[in-house]
């Protein structure tokens, strides 16, 4: 799972260990070697799970099936999708690797190209207090705002979508409840 950056957080810890970074300077060399091997297997998994659309590398799903490596559902509101959230941390990790292979370079470039293609422009979050006195937000048009990326994109169309605890895919964040809307 890449969900909530779980795997990337672990890989960053593994890297600190095999590079003997503080606070892991005391780890014996035999464990550093094992840790490096585990990290390298993680990179292999990242490369194998990168989703292709029409033969082009894109990004990753938050959750992949452990056998088929295909995008799969996690929690009820986390449908199979391309992830605009977890994928950025995956790509940043790959970008940080010294002397990357051509396969890693292609992976990075595919993800960057996808992020450029699907960025959402002309919208920003506007916060307000709702009728129950809770902090909430809505999306409003703007002309000079920075681009945004959705957390979930349709696997085939790249259209941003949202889902509530009922697992129903909708295309406006206003269509989901306060709890999930403010949990994205």
Regions found by a protein language model. Give the residues of each.
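Short, structured motif recognition centered on aromatic/hydrophobic residues
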Residues: 14, 43-46, 87-94, 112-115
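CBM-like carbohydrate-recognition segments
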Residues: 52, 56, 113-184
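Solvent-exposed loop and edge beta-strand segments that line ligand/cofactor-binding
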Residues: 1-7, 73-86, 97-100
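Beta-propeller domains
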Residues: 3, 7, 26-27, 31-57, ...
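Flexible internal linker/loop segments at domain or repeat junctions
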Residues: 54-79
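Structural helix-adjacent loops and short alpha-helical linkers that scaffold large soluble proteins
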Residues: 18-40, 97-109
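Solenoidal tandem-repeat scaffolds enriched in leucines and small polar residues
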Residues: 1-14, 19-23, 27
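Intrinsic disorder/low-complexity detector
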Residues: 15-24, 37, 41-44, 116, ...
């Amino acid at each position: 799972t890449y969900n909530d950056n779980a795997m990337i957080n672990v890989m960053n810890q593994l890297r600190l260990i095999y590079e003997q970074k503080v606070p892991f300077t005391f780890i014996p060399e035999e464990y550093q070697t094992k840790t490096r091997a585990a990290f390298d297997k993680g990179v292999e998994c990242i490369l194998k799970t990168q989703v292709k659309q029409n033969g082009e590398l894109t990004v990753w799903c938050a959750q992949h099936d452990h056998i088929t490596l295909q995008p799969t559902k996690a929690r009820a509101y986390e449908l199979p999708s391309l992830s605009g959230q977890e994928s950025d941390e995956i790509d940043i990790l790959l970008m940080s690797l010294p002397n990357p292979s051509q396969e890693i370079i292609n992976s990075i470039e595919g993800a960057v190209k996808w992020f450029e293609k699907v960025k959402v422009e002309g919208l920003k979050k506007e916060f307000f207090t709702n009728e129950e006195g809770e902090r909430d937000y809505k999306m409003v048009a703007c002309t000079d705002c920075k681009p945004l990326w959705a957390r979930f994109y349709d696997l085939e169309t790249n259209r941003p979508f949202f889902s509530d605890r009922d697992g129903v895919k909708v295309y406006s964040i206003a269509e989901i409840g306060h709890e999930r809307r403010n949990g994205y």
